[in-house]
């Protein structure tokens, strides 16, 4: 018999959906039924989500100064609130947990108005706009990189780390094996769940600048946006090298486990996953992030020695080629970085977050939860 329904709310990108998925698996192990509320974008990432049902609720962000656009967004939010209220009244969840992104706002607001226990999980080192809007209303705030007892809501905040999917936990069992001169070198390049156009343009040029001996060693996995597939595929064909390119890899965990180096953005889920697996990385924060959250996430891992951070404005093809030349000839350095990254990982984050969910659902306070963890 189920202990009750937990309703998870997540924005429709991998950065929000993946940690929610990891928690969902853990809650199901503990005897709960899990439902997910999100937007239509999440269908791409929710294929393995262990939910009894996935609900799409209307939502919108108010980012325009156009009065017509603002009015349309407010109408959509109001519609989402009504739909979320009906959903919560029907499901009667024991708790509603938000993972950030504007689609979480209607269900979390509806839950607080109905008196249902609520909490949010903030993946980044800087709190996002949706979570900021909800933080004063919820009973607890779990943080991936937020400092425990710090920030604007110290009495509510518990540092759990970012939960990672079972596939990542399995990949973490694979030890890092360095690639020595003359051996194949697995390079994984991606820009988060939605890709990064900059890498699609810069990497092929960088590879063309490498010595033939190094280029022949490379085995590349690169996530490429659909509109860039033809361009990148043509460059790869000209270079006559081994490369897998695709808009999305369902087996990314296994590919990361085989990687000798990762070049990627520094979204919270990405940084958490590569640290749990323990792989050296060159992190390139997304330069247009509103709160510079990716720069803060990257700095946290770089401080441990597990990653090198380079601003996109400084990452020319020549710079990439120089980095690859250096590290492909220095397997010992990459091994040290891999070990440092793994030490920074929090593989038990899903369990810690599930403990917090159960505590709040049972009516316990954050202060009580912290005392039991001490």
Swiss-Prot record:
Pathway: Cell wall biogenesis; peptidoglycan biosynthesis
Location of this chain's protein in the cell: Cell inner membrane
InterPro entries linked to this entry: GlcNAc_MurG, Glyco_trans_28_C, GlycoTrans_28_N
GO function term, MF aspect, one: UDP-N-acetyl-D-glucosamine:N-acetylmuramoyl-L-alanyl-D-glutamyl-meso-2,6-diaminopimelyl-D-alanyl-D-alanine-diphosphoundecaprenol 4-beta-N-acetylglucosaminlytransferase activity
Protein name: UDP-N-acetylglucosamine--N-acetylmuramyl-(pentapeptide) pyrophosphoryl-undecaprenol N-acetylglucosamine transferase
Lineage, top ranks: Bacteria, Pseudomonadati, Pseudomonadota, Alphaproteobacteria, Hyphomicrobiales
PANTHER family (alphabetical): GLYCOSYLTRANSFERASE (PTHR21015:SF22), UDP-N-ACETYLGLUCOSAMINE--N-ACETYLMURAMYL-(PENTAPEPTIDE) PYROPHOSPHORYL-UNDECAPRENOL N-ACETYLGLUCOSAMINE TRANSFERASE 1 (PTHR21015)
Main location: membrane
One family name in Pfam for this protein: Glyco_transf_28
Tagged with keyword Cell division: yes
Function text: Cell wall formation. Catalyzes the transfer of a GlcNAc subunit on undecaprenyl-pyrophosphoryl-MurNAc-pentapeptide (lipid intermediate I) to form undecaprenyl-pyrophosphoryl-MurNAc-(pentapeptide)GlcNAc (lipid intermediate II).
EC numbers, comma separated: 2.4.1.227
GO biological process: carbohydrate metabolic process; cell division; cell wall organization; lipid glycosylation; peptidoglycan biosynthetic process; regulation of cell shape
Family matches, as Gene3D superfamilies: Glycogen Phosphorylase B
Gene behind this protein: murG
tRNA-binding is among the record's keywords: no
Family membership noted in the UniProt record: Belongs to the glycosyltransferase 28 family. MurG subfamily.
